[in-house]
């Protein structure tokens, strides 16, 4: 369900861990980000949106979601000549799967250590989201 330009868009995505690495996807425009996508009418909640998008974009469908952490980012971008507000709900998940089948929406992927991922992520808000996730993991006894 894509909204009209100028109306609030909502997306959901995962910071996806595999042991001590996280998954980043590269978009055709060149930027690197986490798997995410727009909420659709058939989605029952934000977790189902994030999981559907993860599966569509990477082929990964088996994840364990950390329900104790969520981060919301908000920003505005230009779509069809109009400023469009967007909110993204980020969740933390883990998987044992490492093989990625990229969709047509992306050109590359990398599993990276958190420090390397933070350097590669294009947008500052997403770097901050990664730092927040890392703090949550550390407070839960994970040292990444």
Segments (PLM) and residue ranges:
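NUDIX/MutT-family hydrolases
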Residues: 90, 101-133
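Acidic, metal-coordinating catalytic segment for phosphate/diphosphate chemistry
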Residues: 1-13
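Short loop segments at secondary-structure junctions
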Residues: 19-21, 94-99, 114-116
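Conserved Nudix-box catalytic region and its N-terminal flanking loop in Nudix hydrolases
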Residues: 18-60
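Active-site segment of metal-dependent pyrophosphate-handling enzymes
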Residues: 59-98
């Amino acid at each position: 369900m894509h909204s009209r330009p100028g109306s609030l868009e909502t997306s959901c995505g995962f910071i996806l861990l595999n042991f001590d690495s996280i998954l980043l996807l590269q978009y055709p425009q060149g930027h690197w980000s986490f798997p995410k996508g727009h909420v659709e009418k058939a989605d029952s909640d934000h977790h189902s949106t994030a999981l559907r998008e993860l599966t569509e974009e990477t082929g990964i469908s088996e994840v364990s979601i950390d329900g104790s952490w969520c981060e919301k980012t908000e920003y505005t971008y230009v779509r069809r000549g109009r400023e469009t507000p967007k909110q993204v709900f980020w969740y933390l998940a883990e998987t044992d799967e490492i093989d990625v089948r990229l969709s047509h929406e992306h050109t590359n992927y990398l599993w990276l250590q958190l420090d390397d991922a933070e350097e590669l992520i294009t947008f500052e808000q997403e770097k901050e989201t990664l730092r927040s996730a890392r703090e949550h993991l550390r407070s839960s006894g994970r040292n990444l």
